[in-house]
């Protein structure tokens, strides 16, 4: 029997070491409690994007500066589209996805909203549940488009559970 693939996603190469500890702990607990090796656990770092990294001499800040001059919806659509293209093949055969730790539910200072939106859109039509484990929560601002997009994604039927550390 082929093992089912559980993908653990997060910001595992972030400077916040607490996020890495939470991800390591979650992976340990999952592997410890898997019965008969039914699942393989694979990690995916959300800080990585093929499209953003394909610009050899441009740094992400420069790309974001260019995007900031576009209309908000064009900029947001571009970012989400980049991540969706990255995720299309990565999560195609995933049986479940776990966001392990991190300040995932953020919209002001990081692209969590874009990562989460792209991931939910990518697996929306597949039987692949998404779980959020020990995530940090930043707040909510109804007037912020990114926050509303994040709220919409978190309320999608693919999201099965959210636990917070706050």
Predicted regions and their residues:
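Aromatic- and Gly/Pro-rich donor/ligand-binding loops
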Residues: 2-154
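A short beta-strand/loop micro-motif in the catalytic core of glycosyltransferases
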Residues: 18, 159-166
């Amino acid at each position: 029997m082929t093992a089912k693939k559980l993908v653990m996603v997060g910001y595992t190469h972030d400077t916040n070491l607490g996020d890495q500890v939470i991800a390591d702990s979650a992976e340990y607990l999952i592997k410890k409690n898997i019965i008969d090796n039914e699942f393989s656990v694979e990690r995916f770092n959300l800080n990585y994007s093929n499209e953003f990294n394909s610009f050899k001499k441009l740094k992400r800040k420069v790309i974001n500066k260019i995007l900031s001059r576009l209309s908000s919806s064009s900029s947001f659509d571009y970012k989400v589209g980049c991540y969706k293209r990255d995720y299309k093949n990565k999560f195609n055969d995933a049986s479940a996805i776990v966001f392990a730790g991190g300040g995932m539910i953020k919209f002001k200072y990081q692209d969590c909203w874009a990562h989460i939106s792209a991931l939910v859109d990518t697996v929306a039509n597949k039987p692949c549940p998404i779980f959020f484990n020990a995530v940090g929560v930043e707040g909510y601002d109804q007037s912020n488009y990114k926050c509303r997009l994040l709220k919409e994604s978190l309320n999608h039927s693919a999201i099965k559970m959210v636990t917070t550390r706050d």
